[in-house]
UniProtKB/Swiss-Prot annotation:
It comes from Phocaeicola vulgatus (strain ATCC 8482 / DSM 1447 / JCM 5826 / CCUG 4940 / NBRC 14291 / NCTC 11154) (Bacteroides vulgatus). InterPro entries: SurE, SurE-like_Pase/nucleotidase, SurE-like_sf. This is 5'-nucleotidase SurE. GO terms for molecular function: 5'-nucleotidase activity; metal ion binding; nucleotide binding. It catalyses: a ribonucleoside 5'-phosphate + H2O = a ribonucleoside + phosphate. NCBIfam families: PRK00346.2-2 (NF001492), surE (TIGR00087). Binds 1 divalent metal cation per subunit.
Amino acid sequence: MKKEKPLILLSNDDGVEAKGLNELIRGLRGMGEIIVMAPDGPRSGASGAITSEHPVKYYKVREEEDLTVYKCTGTPVDCVKLALHTVVPRRPDVVIGGINHGDNSSVNVHYSGTMGVVIEGCLKGISSIGYSLCNHFADADFSSSLPYIRRITEQVLEHGLPLGICLNVNFPDTASLKGVRICRQTNGAWINEWKRSLHPRGGEYFWLTGEFDNYEPEAEDSDHWALGHGYVAVTPTQIDVTAYGMMNELKNWNLEV
């Protein structure tokens, strides 16, 4: 009996035309049947947003051997939900988000539409991976990341991931990658996030900007340290965000009324 090819579902938050997504497709060709359901335009920072106030549509934009590409009017999470409900012929072997234009290390994982894709796949019990490059430009060079993407994806297809666990993989913007580091998420936060401007017709408006404040720049087990030193940062990420260590302490609080 002929073995089925792996079924790979891709999406992103930069849109179906983004270079990162198309480089991801190129890097994964030959590994299985690839189905893409991506937003019809940029949806960066969408996180886990879903569309509930109006209908969502999708359209086929490309089809060739072992590759079918659709664009969707919804969010990145909508794309995964809709693809699983409509266009995939069976349960995917892996869900992949990316390659994102810009890193999703540290707290960025909470804002990221790319990781929204990954978390949605993980919630559905499917092994899921997010790939991101530390370069926001539309013409970013993803070539050095592609061999690692292929290897990591092969390993996930071979071993699988435990229920509730997904991978957040970030690449430094360099042609000379030093290798892979298994990392934890860096502790930090965005500061000075808003640029205020005055409108010529009166009033004010704001652009989201900001800078990242790394609370632990010397932490060699963190993703930011790895990226800053030329390593691919692989961070296992979990769906269950319960702070188990706090549960017993809370039981001692007087919370009843």
